[in-house]
Amino acid sequence: MQTANEIRRTFLDFFEKNGHTVVNSSPLVPRNDPTLMFTNAGMVQFKNVFTGIEKRDYVRAASSQKCVRAGGKHNDLDNVGYTARHHTFFEMLGNFSFGDYFKDLAIEHAWNLITKDFGIDKSRLLVTVYHDDDQAADAWKKIAGLPESRIIRIPTSDNFWAMGDTGPCGPCSEIFYDHGEHIFGGPPGSPDQDGDRFIEIWNLVFMQFEQVDKETRIPLPKPSIDTGMGLERLAALLQGKHDNYDVDLLRALIEASAEASNTDPDGPHKVSHRVVADHLRSSSFLIADGVLPSNEGRGYVLRRIMRRAMRHAHLMGCTEPLLHKLVPALTRQMGEAYPELVRANALITETLKLEETRFKVTLDKGLKLLDDEITRIGSGQKLAGEVAFKLYDTYGFPLDLTQDALKAKGIGVDTDGFASAMERQRAEARKAWAGSGDTATETVWFELREKLGASEFLGYDAEQAEGKIVALVENGKVVEAVHPGHQVAVIANQTPFYGESGGQMGDTGVITLGTPGTGGKATIAVTDTQKKLGDLIVHFGTVEGGPVAVGEDAHFAVESTRRDATRGHHSATHLLHAALRDILGDHVTQKGSQVGPDRLRFDFAHTKALSAEETRAVEAEVNRRIRLNAEVATKVMTPDDAIKAGAMALFGEKYGEEVRVVSMGDLSTELCGGTHANRTGDIGGFKIVAESAVASGVRRIEAVTGPAFLAWAQAQEDLLAKAADTLKAAPADLPARIAGLMDDRRKLERELAEVRKQLATGGGQGAATKTVNGITYAGKVLSGVPAKDLKGMADEIKKQIGSGIIALVSDADGKASIVVCVTEDLTSKHSAVDLVRIGSEALGGKGGGGRPDMAQAGGPDASAAQAAVDRIEQALGG
């Protein structure tokens, strides 16, 4: 029996032998495609190749692409665990032709692979074609020898694929396997086609048209091929199984789940084991590709998947977190094919454990609420949307988790009611998914990149260089010349200026027209440099001294002081990354960075704030590595060779065919395209100035080095000297001096509060009151009294007068606050809430809130404090 790993290898080897380049799976987070939440097909990474935007040095490719379908248009989450072939994570095997071979060879490759290399019985195979695709039908007859009866023509969109409303499209042909008469189901196109007898195993898409608009479809000049075959389905067929969850890849995880939970893998918890196995795969691969659980976007989909698996672990009786214990089994099965699982092992394990530990706190309470509500639901009724929303909002139950929990009991959820409850809280809720990825780049950069090619960067070795201006852009348009005083974007054939990328800010400096010594007629003050489309370096600045034209020679000079400071900060981030991993653990991975001349910012995966001891240890370790003065060296190699050599890469980052590897002795080795110090000693000192949270599971460190460190230290000295001068104390005596002042302040605050209370209550003589319409009324303006003290003062007056109404207004800090207290015997006639609103309106406010016996409000007009007291008196009939 072939294992799934062997099947994947056979597929890729077959196409490699037939002239295809084997391309690694792209990350699950699509790059430069805001239309997709997750990579869900093999062709996603080739989309720009199919449309002609991107060109590669091969015209045939094959891949095994990791895919996730959960959330958005393609969402299989609800069915996972209950059916034989639904998954949130799966692998798609595919071969692709970009204007090279077409239908005949695509069909020949497919037929030879499945019947010869995989040995599938030809008599069990049948195919579909689009109803008018005679070319494909004839190819199947000629190449595979299939009779007309086993070539089914389908007139629907099931056999016509389109990338969107416009763009490449074409007919497709699907290969089906007949599992035999003992299984219910009819052939494709028949009324019983949804049965399990005939299962699609491979889809061949023939991209031969371009959809111009709704009415117009024209032939493509270079037709292409896009195929997709699910590895899990193919493995089930080749391993003699009719259920994807019985193939070795998933069965190993199911058995690991059963062992860890001490339950039968095929017993009452069969569905739960299947859910755990599938969701472990999708969760682990998403984390490895840089997605962390959160309450929005991709992170929320990950959280939904994880929490659904955690509920099923709970159903199996697990009282401790389960999922993280299964990561080793997953790594054994898939770590060789996908080394990112091995590299991210610690991060995956810790993230799963932390999320499950947190969710367990509310899971039991939420399930108890759900059980209580189920007992109240009558026959044919649904769970109220308000209850589903409470489970979501209070207990962290995604809606689909609640639906899944009710599925076995045959109970639905009032989703409209849930949506209404969600709408009411929209102002407080986080923004819903609005896409991700890079903003669509302006057309002008695409056109210039196509025309000019990549910019040559000289800045690794030089800060000054000669070049030629090859394009000018003003106000978003390509121009031939720009006049003095105008802002311009400049592209040169070569430049020492670094374009912002990889977290490193772009260079500034001066471009001088003409060659040095010839009296340059104009300059461009460069205020920023950016990279467009990955390798087009664009200088942004203002023209000075004379006009600038395309084709002119120019001298490019980077501002060296700023570049040096930036280089030091960039090299320090590498040392910081390594130190964090050494001190906190291998789960620490970079989540983002920003490097400039003034400071560095480094975001990393870690689940809790650093203690003062950890912060000091990290800082000391970075400084130790700086003092070793190791040489900073760079090499250019393939990403695979770099990672094999021990270089750290960013999970989910897309790298080209060659990468720069920056090593600092044996202190740090990372893939990086930025500029760096020559030796670690050039960085100077390193100081952490801030540590904070960015998102769940992501921390941020801000630090300074070199001249920025010196400036920071001098600023701290100035602050210390100023504080010492203000307090008339030596800097060393400041802690004791401040502690003494704080004690004095607390003592004075207590005394002041007592004085205010005495003033409010009449200084021991009783509060000043008047009788209004038979009611004792104590109304008073208290200047400078904090709003938080008003309720306590009102309670004191209430004790004195026994029965009555109190209104106290404070005008502290230019704002007015008002408290109204009504004794219990009067609340049936007068409400404190109604009276406080009258006072608030006088203060320019908009009402207030509280109880019938005590309410509080405020307003911006402190000058109307007495008017507020008088208005309430008038309302009582005074």
From Swiss-Prot:
EC number(s) recorded for this UniProt protein: 6.1.1.7
Compartment annotation: Cytoplasm
Positions contributing to Zn(2+) binding: 570, 574, 672, 676
Enzyme class at the top of the EC tree: ligase
Biased composition (Low complexity): 855-864
Catalyzed reactions per annotation: tRNA(Ala) + L-alanine + ATP = L-alanyl-tRNA(Ala) + AMP + diphosphate
MF GO annotations: alanine-tRNA ligase activity; aminoacyl-tRNA deacylase activity; ATP binding; tRNA binding; zinc ion binding
Cellular component, GO annotation: cytosol
Endpoints of the signal sequence: none
Cofactor(s) essential for the protein: Zn(2+)
Protein family (similarity comment): Belongs to the class-II aminoacyl-tRNA synthetase family.
The protein's name in its UniProt record: Alanine--tRNA ligase
